[in-house]
Amino acid sequence: YEWETCDYMKALELYQSRSEKYVKKQGEDLSSILSGITSFKGDVHLTFCPMITEQDLMAYDSLPGIEYNREVAKLMDRRIHAGYRLTPNNFIAHDIRFGKHEFKGDRYTDEQKDRFLHHLKKLEKYDVDEPEVLMDIFLGIYSNPVDNCFERNH
């Protein structure tokens, strides 16, 4: 998605879970699902990666259980990241989070950045002790896919 549908809720949950166990309220999952379905997403890209086959898994047969599971998870991540399409918002968040202009011009315009900054500004309405931490978590939701996708290519 160009716009993460529950980005504010996700950021707040992660923020709260840093200092206390986050306990979901009754019906919160259903509310998140409905919000995710009905909320504006902007551009949407759907990719189906190649199926993980028995032959793929055989490469890890000699590994003990936990290592086997880790390697299968890495394989799944590689498949997902290979088909992931990054959006301008991912690159904007990455540049803001790390104080750079690495992707400006190539991956996003000033207009796109202004739109993202307007969206980001809405975080100010949340009364939290460490707003900079909440902002970093929020930016991470959008910027982490950049790191994940670039790691697979390097």
Language-model segment annotations:
Residues 1-154:
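Membrane-interfacial terminal anchoring regions of lipid-handling membrane enzymes
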